[in-house]
């Protein structure tokens, strides 16, 4: 199970427009190994109302999911 800052309920693909992360969310949904609720496929333990504020944490999760474009995500923003 993935954790962010010790919290296992935060989804890396939550609604992020307030934090300017719309581009990252769209990118991960299109190219990442994530389903619509935000966790790696077949690992649904998230509350999509939780908010993630660190773009670098999304990149780290992408890297752990073996997404070769995790650095590109940061460079694109």
UniProtKB/Swiss-Prot annotation:
Gene3D superfamilies the UniProt entry points to: Ankyrin repeat-containing domain (1.25.40.20)
Keywords from the named record: ANK repeat
Annotated InterPro entries: Ankyrin_rpt, Ankyrin_rpt-contain_sf
Keyword Cell membrane among UniProt keywords: no
ANK repeats: 8-38
Identification of the protein by name: Putative ankyrin repeat protein RC0956
Keyword Transferase: no
Source organism: Rickettsia conorii (strain ATCC VR-613 / Malish 7)
């Amino acid at each position: 199970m993935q954790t962010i800052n010790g919290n296992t309920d935060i989804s890396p693909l939550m609604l992020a427009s307030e934090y300017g992360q719309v581009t990252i969310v769209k990118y991960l949904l299109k190219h990442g190994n994530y389903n619509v609720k935000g966790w790696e496929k077949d690992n649904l333990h998230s509350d999509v109302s939780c908010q993630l504020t660190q773009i670098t944490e999304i990149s780290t999760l992408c890297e752990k999911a073996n997404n070769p474009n995790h650095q590109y995500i940061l460079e694109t923003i």
